[in-house]
Every structure is written in structure tokens, then in C-alpha cells.
Amino acid sequence: GSGKWRDAYYTNQDAYLDGSGNLFLRARVKDGKFMTSYLQTYSWQAPRSQWTTFGPGRGKYIEARIDVTRMQARGPWAAFWLFDPSDTYDGNPSNGTEIDIMEYIVDGGWMLNRYNVANHWGSSESRIIDAAAHGKNLRRHWHTFGLEWTSSRLSYYIDGKQVWSTTRGVSTSNEQALMLTIEYDQGPGDAWGINQNVFNDAAKLPDGMLVDYVRVYERK
């Protein structure tokens, strides 16, 4: 996607292959603006026949292998998620929800080795996952972030290990799109209350998120 959302400006030039087969979502400051990339498998500028969306079917497992160690500037957050662009927040999960498989925000404090998982449908459920409690260090190496999705349950994983599960507000929509994004909101009132000013860390930019793959498996 392109344009402005919250306090970030999005360009197609800030998503590219790094020369080693990985996708890099870059974050940078240019002309006093925070610029990055927002990738989605739908577009209101394209016919729906060109969208890539899906539902739980007989059961899905969605996984991405991601490296967030290059995220250095405080304030922006990297995310891997599902989103139904039609009626996500109308309170009816059958019309789709926002399913956050991984949201990671750089912070010098307690959030540095934690990430967020969530499901939003008008109401919300979310959990802050302490990676260390599962033997993981987000500031080192690659990690896989996964979601097992059935019509009645969402189960969240890191490196194949379940970290949370919920049966509330589960989407049964067939129009959930895949999203890979870096977002920024200076606040107040967003960015989970951390409200860091990315321009105070401009010397650490450009930074970004590396993605090895995104895979969607369906139970037969």
C-alpha cells in the first residue's frame, strides 16, 4: 500500500528483496517524515478477483519466518496479521476480524523481548507474550510466528510452540487477507501506551524487518 496511515508514510520502494532471497521492509526518515512499507494481499484499487483472501475452511495454519533484530528505533512496530477489509470491527466475527499473529515494538524497557498477539472484532482479546518464558530471544536470530485457525479456535505459536489460544470472536469469514507491515503512531493513546518518538532515534534508521517466507497450510 501507499499513502499515509497514523504517523507513517508508506511507499512501494520500502519493500524489496535483500539479495539473499529475503523480503526486507525498511523504515527510514526522509524530509522529516517517517517512511516504511505496508504490504497486503488486497487493494481497493484492484478488482476482488485479484485479491488473495481465505477463511478457516477445514483448518488453516499460517506461518511466517521473521527476523526483528534489525528493528532498532523506538516507536514503530512490526506486524504479521490477518485482516478482513470489509466489516472487521462490526462486532460480528462471521464478517471477519483483525488477527494479530505477531506485533513487535522496539522499546528499551520490558517490551524488548515481548510481542503481542490479538484478535479484534469490535470487542478484543490480546496477550503480551514473554518470549523468554518460552525459551526464546527475539533479539537474536530468526523465529517463526504461526496461527492455527479453525472455525471455533485461534491458537498462536512461536517456533512451533503454542503460546496462547482463544475461542472468543473467531472469524469464519472467507475474506481474510495477509498483512506484513511496519506502523507508527507517536501517540498519545496508541502504540500500546509506550508513545516513543521515532525521530529521537533517527540516527538508528534505516532499520526494518526481514521475512524469509509466509506459508498457508490447509487441513485436508
Where are these regions (language model features)?
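GH16 jelly-roll
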Residues: G1-K220
